[in-house]
Amino acid sequence: MTTPLLQDLQDRGLIAQASDLEEIQTLLSQPQTVYCGFDPTAGSLHIGHLVPLIMLKRFQDAGHQAVALIGGATGMIGDPSFKATERSLNSAEIVSGWVNDLSNQIQQLMNHQLSKPMIMVNNADWMRAINVIDFFRDVGKHFSINTMINRESVKQRLQRPDQGISFTEFSYALLQSYDFAELNRQYGCRLQIGGNDQWGNIVSGIDLTRRQNGEQVFGLTLPLITKSDGTKFGKTEGGAVWLDPSKTSPYAFYQFWLGAEDADVYHFLRYYTFLSCEEIASIEAQDQASQGKPQAQRILAEEMTRFVHGEEGLASAERITQALFSGNVQQLSLGELKQLELDGLPSIESAQQDLVELLIESGLASSKRVAREHISNNAISVNGEKVSADNPSLSFPLFDQYWLLQRGKKHFCLVKRAA
């Protein structure tokens, strides 16, 4: 009989591969320890990390113990799985700083939403204690080079004439496999989850844990989240969408989810939110009957912004959205303009008086030519009024301090006139 958790994950389309689904069903009939690893590649997580993080919460909410592993050791090397080129190696100081940042971020994000804390570990804590000879003897002897080079994630690199793979990256699978064996020893961990690109590493960890510990453990991977057009979900024109509000404001985060396509939004509600599949089906049915006024994008944006940034972050995002999209910008008070800046609307301070230069400085145009094209295409507004190509100039600043620049429907920048 399928456990309610596993049935829910299947209904949501959240299981890509499993080492033994029937055995996992049996395993999850009792409380278990489950882990997922996060390598530090920057000082913040991004939305690509949300599905595995949310997956850990789903397990913990179902009565299991979640473990989030930060790869202080593996992050020094970098996972080569399905990467086209060799990763750049970062210094120990940089990686250590990122480890602290991610650990704090995960704890702040997750623990207040859980009835008991998630366990946080750093694989550098045990990898530092192993010398290289012992590692090769005790771990390396269990790995077949033939098997490793035939894994699809490695084979793609080896088949490229312009790219090989260094021994450093090639050894990554051994380190991740050892993590599984170590967590099994320390915490009795018997299930690892990860992205589908981690399948080869997870299988290696299952095998090593069996050989070293005599324990049967299991793995489960999550699907690669793609949009209906086949492209990878999670980035914008400006790059990654970060969970750190200083890198991606709650407003920009909210707008990202609000922009989900109709063909994608119901899948995303299943992947990312804790709304039941029945509730999501009801939302979809209501949207189909609403004649072009769907509510799904707003619900998705609200749920995700609340999850990552809390009620306060959601309120600020909705406040900006209401101000920018529902009325005349010139009706905003000075206090409301200042609040937009505090709430995270893209903002700059400038003494520049030329509109074309300001469009470049604000990031709304990449060059003078592009700025002029936007103006010619009637895509630029200043303080809520379209700019004429015949007279591309700045209007008087609101309250003698602010210009609100807009490109198209969704791109804004608040410019404060420098004193």
Curated annotation (Swiss-Prot):
Motif ('HIGH' region): 40-49
Chain positions of motif 'KMSKS' region: 232-236
Enzyme Commission number, as recorded: 6.1.1.1
Residues reported in the UniProt entry to bind ATP: K235
GO biological process: tyrosyl-tRNA aminoacylation
Gene behind this protein: tyrS1
One Pfam family in the UniProt entry: tRNA-synt_1b
Binding site for L-tyrosine: Y35, Y172, Q176
Role played: Catalyzes the attachment of tyrosine to tRNA(Tyr) in a two-step reaction: tyrosine is first activated by ATP to form Tyr-AMP and then transferred to the acceptor end of tRNA(Tyr).
Family assignment from sequence similarity: Belongs to the class-I aminoacyl-tRNA synthetase family. TyrS type 1 subfamily.
Subcellular location: Cytoplasm
InterPro entries: aa-tRNA-synth_I_CS, aa-tRNA-synth_Ic, Rossmann-like_a/b/a_fold, S4_RNA-bd_sf, SYY-like_C, Tyr-tRNA-ligase, Tyr-tRNA-ligase_bac-type, Tyr-tRNA-ligase_bac_1
Keywords: Aminoacyl-tRNA synthetase, ATP-binding, Cytoplasm, Ligase, Nucleotide-binding, Protein biosynthesis, RNA-binding
Name of the molecule in the record: Tyrosine--tRNA ligase 1
A cellular component term, taken from the record's GO annotations: cytosol
Superkingdom assignment: Bacteria
The protein's assembly and partners: Homodimer.
Domain S4 RNA-binding: 353-418
Catalytic activity: tRNA(Tyr) + L-tyrosine + ATP = L-tyrosyl-tRNA(Tyr) + AMP + diphosphate + H(+)
Source organism phylogeny: Bacteria, Pseudomonadati, Pseudomonadota, Gammaproteobacteria, Vibrionales
Source organism: Vibrio parahaemolyticus serotype O3:K6 (strain RIMD 2210633)
Top-rank EC class of the record's enzyme: ligase
